[in-house]
Amino acid sequence: MPDGTLMVPNGWSPEHGPREDGVMHDQQLVWDLFQNYAEAAKALGIDVDYQIKIADMQAHLAPNKIGKWGQLQEWQADRDDPDDQHRHTSHLFAVYPGRQISLNETPKLAKAAIIALRSRSGNYGKNINTPFTLESTVGDSRRSWTWPWRCALWARLGDGEKAGMMIRGLLTYNTLPNLFTSHPPFQMDGNFGISGAIAEMLLQSQAGEIQLLPAIPKNWATEGAFYGFKARGGFTINCKWVNGKVIFYQIYSEKPEKVKLRVNGQLKEVLSERLK
């Protein structure tokens, strides 16, 4: 752009809307690419001059926008329809699997993402006062891969109840008797995707800290445990909980390292144990 703003040209928000420059899905993909490169180059101690160039380009990417009804926009133009229940949530890539938007670091954008996700689930616009239930998530939203993606999105946005509803939705509407997931034909995306989404409900590490139980529903809270989960930075995590509270955890790595840990609502710095 003449003012130096960088946009991906001639993009398309997958299977939805017109082709144009600066589609949010494309912008978010490039932001993630630049962020991943910058962190990898810094860790390896390489490409110092090129790191500066990439950081400058990242800073000039056209940013995410909040639209007229509070939604995270899908395009540069504010044309999102609050009653659109399209199956894709491509403009929420920055929430999951990306990491540009988070509750703690970008709360205004996270709130806008929640509004956009409610809209795609049929819980905004003319249905804004309709309770969010499994049954209200209808029509185009019932796909093998849609339930897991939205489960992971709700987990990243800290809503364990809605994340849990997405698991139940996949089992109720898009799982065959042999446990293959359907689109309605067989589609493996749902089987693979839901395991990743469940992991996001139990452990997150995308925002510079390890968070235990970020989004568990009430019916999981009584008692539970997980072992051997992996977190960014090469950490292995074990965890037990009772009544929604972590009562035990272990963090392992190749060598003892300090790490930020969010547990039971408290952020602390702990030292990992050496893997044996």
Residue ranges with predicted function:
Residues 23-206, 247:
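Active-site core of glycosidic bond-cleaving carbohydrate-active enzymes
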Residues 161-275:
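Non-catalytic C-terminal accessory modules of carbohydrate-active enzymes
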